[in-house]
């Protein structure tokens, strides 16, 4: 089950006295509550690739585990997805004001050097907009 986090959580969430904007898609996994301290656990797909990051639960009895997807590219033939906007948790999208790749570029981290060397378009589809050019 996909959750549009901006609609589900009304855009902002407060944690430790700070407001955070929730954006993107998550996956809801029935009967999965990993318990306290498990936020940040990896969600793997059937090919053992990272698909998302576990962050919490939803439902009256915490019966639905939630994982933030790393990447979302909606299919236009699904009504629910047609209203969604493509995004990438690392590279952002046209609506993102701050994103992780921006941080790694500004601080010249090791990850930025690795990103520049990627030749696989599968991992760079958001970067192709003018705003997200990492080169």
UniProtKB/Swiss-Prot annotation:
Instruction: Specify the superkingdom.
Output: Bacteria
Name the family: Belongs to the MG067/MG068/MG395 family.
InterPro entries in the record: Flavi_NS3_S7 (IPR001850), Uncharacterised_MG067 (IPR022381)
Task: Give the protein's recorded name.
Answer: Uncharacterized protein MPN_584
Which GO molecular function annotation, any one, does this entry have? RNA helicase activity
Coiled coil regions in record: none
């Amino acid at each position: 089950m996909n959750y549009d986090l901006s609609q589900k959580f009304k855009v902002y969430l407060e944690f430790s006295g700070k407001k955070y904007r929730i954006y993107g898609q998550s996956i809801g996994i029935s009967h999965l509550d990993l318990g306290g301290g498990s936020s940040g656990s990896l969600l793997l797909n059937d090919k053992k690739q990272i698909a998302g990051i576990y962050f919490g639960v939803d439902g009256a009895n915490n019966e639905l585990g939630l994982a933030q997807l790393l990447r979302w590219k909606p299919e236009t033939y699904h009504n629910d997805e047609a209203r969604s906007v493509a995004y990438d948790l690392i590279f952002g999208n046209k609506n993102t004001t701050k994103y992780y790749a921006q941080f790694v570029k500004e601080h010249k981290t090791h990850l930025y050097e690795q990103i520049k060397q990627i030749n696989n378009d599968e991992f760079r589809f958001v970067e192709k907009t003018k705003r997200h050019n990492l080169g």
